[in-house]
Amino acid sequence: YHGAPADLRDIPLGTFLHVRSFLPPDPKTSVVPVLPVNSKDEAHGYSGKGTRPAENHVLLLEDEPSHCLREGKVWKLMEVELKNNEGTIKARREPAAGGDATVEEETMSFDADIRIWHGRERITVKDLINEGIWPKNGKQTLDGQAVQLGITWKPNYGNEYDHLYVSDIWLDDAAMLHATDLQTETHRAPCAVVGCPPGSM
């Protein structure tokens, strides 16, 4: 989480996560439910498809910035549209070393409570508006500014259950490193009390 080890309790509900997992062992010896291999293709009520995968033994669970840092990728901000301190961002996830013409542009929403990080400081949408970086209302091109994004899911009563929101923007490497350091200390603190397995730090 944020590029550092984490417990599940460190990760807010709704955080968009990437997972690497595998099928359980022999159903006769598995201690967890064994689902049909194609269960992820079945729709379950309002949840849609993909909510009950058969691969329920997890090797790696990571949030968006951790995934991008591990794979050497960044989000390139293409456009922002604002109205009343909330709006949408258009962005592309690309290799940090260079663009990828095959990557599709994503449109994600954000609210006034979005956390924007610059160095060791948290700033707001209003700060970006006052500095002339973002418009007060309307659209503005962002010319592929490279950032890291925290992505989350929120209830949407317009029936867009798969629509994503941006929870955090780290504007530079210093901001991301600071977030990683903070999460590292959050993870270490309980270990100092209860102890952790060797190598888990």
Please tell me what each predicted stretch does.
Residues 1-201:
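Short, flexible, surface-exposed loop segments at domain boundaries
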